[in-house]
Amino acid sequence: MPKEKPHVNIVFIGHVDHGKSTTIGRLLYDTGNIPETIIKKFEEMGEKGKSFKFAWVMDRLKEERERGITIDVAHTKFETPHRYITIIDAPGHRDFVKNMITGASQADAAVLVVAATDGVMPQTKEHAFLARTLGIKHIIVTINKMDMVNYDQKVFEKVKAQVEKLLRTLGYKDFPVIPTSAWNGDNIVKKSDKMPWYNGPTLIEALDQIPEPEKPVDKPLRIPIQDVYSIKGVGTVPVGRVETGKLKVGDVVIFEPASTIFHKPIQGEVKSIEMHHEPLQEALPGDNIGFNVRGVSKNDIKRGDVAGHPDKPPTVVRTKDTFKAQIIVLNHPTAITVGYSPVLHAHTAQVPVRFEQLLAKIDPRTGNITEENPQFIKTGDSAIVVLRPMKPVVLEPVKELPQLGRFAIRDMGMTIAAGMVISIQKGE
């Protein structure tokens, strides 16, 4: 059996109107992966004979977005010679941040799109900070709309320098910077003949070289539960994605915070594991599985619980505990003060939390403190805060288990902040 190509998840980030959707559209168009719905529409128009026009396709994609259907991003897939690539989201989508954090979509790499006409803009910075907060290790930069600046190398070099400065201060080291015109198809899939001065990779070549994501098999087992089913003749079947560690048939697993809430171990033996309706003996990180647990009732566990092994159980933050976190405020209408109580979304859990302390404002690029004990924090600020959950929740310090250490803060139907858990303080 030849080894299967690695799967890589990518997100597109960048300032509004810099060309994220057009770049995605061009990638799909030039690799022959335009969504079915659009091909159907095209055929219905009875234009079978005519070739697809890129502009027409982009109009359809735009219409779908305006009707609230982003290019059904969950299914935007294509292949490169050495990778299976899934585009898991493009911002503009209201729940972009929440989706990235709650593990609906763990991104392995980000494509940062910057328009040659504008250079680095506020959202360029915000999205780059966010990529770092979310733990995205690899970035590919495209300097787009090169056709609007006559494919001028000087303009490219100037914008490239701005972006390099921004990303280096955030700790990104090696990243390709590619001059593109998504609208005309320059350097997306096909090499451009308009920029002979550039001899680096096209976007698709850069995507083909994204390092293979490592599977954290040596860490303790963590499976955030998405759903729980009770199946006749089988029993209780929790469903979730293995984030870390491995699960074998015959293992005993314990569920938290269920065990903490019920004051008794909610645990049982794993009788069987299934993935895509096929039985598995062992499940690894990234596997979406259902597993049958003996001795656990469907009413004992729910979405937001996390399964682990009893010798290294998931860490529970109780209502008498607090946790210290670094957050970036993305969108708050006024200001956040002590006492603010929004909802925390982490892995599959959602719990109300309270801001107990605002310890410091920090410079997100260096981590240096810019103000101790601020009275309030507002949109654009990065800060170190202390939060208390109003219900028990499983969280882990980001340094130990990053998959369970990232969270979004939501309120009023929007994502207010993104953050990571620094440490957990047990209360008495």
From Swiss-Prot:
Spell out the residue ranges making up region: G3.
89-92
Please provide the record's keywords in A-Z order: Cytoplasm, Elongation factor, GTP-binding, Hydrolase, Magnesium, Metal-binding, Nucleotide-binding, Protein biosynthesis
Q: Where is this region: G2?
A: 68-72
GO function terms (MF aspect)? GTP binding; GTPase activity; translation elongation factor activity
As for subcellular location, the record says:
Cytoplasm
- One Pfam match, by short name? GTP_EFTU_D2
G1: region residues:
14-21
Residues at which Mg(2+) binds: 21
> What ranges does the record give for the region G4, renumbered to this chain?
144-147
Annotated segments matching region G5: 181-183
Q: Assign the protein's first listed, main location to one coarse class.
A: cytoplasm
Against CDD domains, the record matches this protein to: EF1_alpha (cd01883), EF1_alpha_II (cd03693), EF1_alpha_III (cd03705)
Q: Name one GO cellular component term.
A: cytoplasm
Report the residue ranges that make up the tr-type G domain in this protein.
5-217
InterPro entries tied to this protein: EFTu-like_2, G_TR_CS, GTP-eEF1A_C, P-loop_NTPase, Small_GTP-bd, T_Tr_GTP-bd_dom, TRAFAC_GTPase_members, Transl_B-barrel_sf
Under Enzyme Commission nomenclature, its number is 3.6.5.3
Q: Which reaction does it catalyse?
A: GTP + H2O = GDP + phosphate + H(+)
Q: What does this protein do?
A: GTP hydrolase that promotes the GTP-dependent binding of aminoacyl-tRNA to the A-site of ribosomes during protein biosynthesis.
Identify its protein family.
Belongs to the TRAFAC class translation factor GTPase superfamily. Classic translation factor GTPase family. EF-Tu/EF-1A subfamily.
Name of the protein this chain belongs to: Elongation factor 1-alpha
Q: Per the UniProt entry, what species is this protein from, by scientific name? A: Pyrococcus abyssi (strain GE5 / Orsay)
**Which gene holds the coding sequence for this protein?**
tuf
